[in-house]
């Protein structure tokens, strides 16, 4: 089924493909990479979940993208920055709104010390440097990212 769907996209008979619930990630992505290929200049393939929460005041009227929780294992800071930018592009294209990117972590603005936190802080720095027009902040826990003022409560020393 994935091959047929990918051929339809390649031929302009479909705009997208929803897949993966009944197939492994590898079996879902393989046809896409073989038939559709990646966008020119793409160095890293990543995945995201598009979430729509009804009657939600957060996100873009309840719409969020969470990336990359399904493909890249333990990405380095440069890869995290690239994933953030790529996901922002996908959000713009699919939702038609300007993304607000949060680099998620188990720490908010230094509330915890760990190598994983350091990696997200560095990824945030890289993303801000390489994509200066992107509305981006980090490192943030999810509630601090979506609840106005939530980050002030969870930041270092509180």
Per-segment meaning from a language model:
Residues 1-158:
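Anion-binding alpha/beta catalytic cores of soluble intermediary-metabolism enzymes, centered on
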């Amino acid at each position: 089924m994935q091959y047929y769907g990918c051929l339809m996209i390649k031929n302009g008979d479909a705009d997208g493909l929803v897949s993966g619930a009944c197939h492994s990630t590898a079996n879902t992505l393989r046809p896409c990479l073989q038939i559709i290929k990646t966008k020119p200049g793409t160095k890293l393939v990543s995945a995201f979940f598009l979430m729509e929460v009804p009657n939600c005041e957060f996100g873009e009227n309840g719409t969020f993208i969470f990336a990359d929780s399904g493909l890249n294992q333990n990405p380095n800071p440069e890869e995290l920055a690239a994933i953030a930018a790529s996901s922002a592009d996908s959000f713009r294209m699919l939702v038609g709104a300007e993304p607000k990117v949060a680099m998620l972590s188990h720490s908010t603005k230094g509330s915890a010390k760990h190598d994983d936190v350091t990696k997200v802080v560095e990824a945030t720095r890289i993303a801000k440097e390489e994509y200066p027009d992107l509305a981006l902040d980090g490192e943030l826990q999810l509630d601090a990212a979506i609840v106005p003022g939530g980050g002030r409560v969870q930041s270092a020393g509180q």
